[in-house]
Amino acid sequence: MTPHDKVMYIIQQLELSDSKVARAIQKSVSSATHKRMRLRDNKFTDEDYQNIRAFYLEKLRSIENLEEENTP
């Protein structure tokens, strides 16, 4: 699976908009859109994959920690 395929999988699984992807990969919305649509052969890079993965894993961990905080 290429980095582009991995990012596309994350986008599909989390139903992310281009603006949310842009924030996670620290690029402009138009850049995220071009990469998603593969315009002018733009693709998500390994750096994009690492950024989006880290961004959303951190968010999921904070959600998971909510359960631990409520444990007596």
Residue ranges and their predicted role:
Residues S19-R23:
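Short alpha-helical "recognition helix" segments of helix-turn-helix
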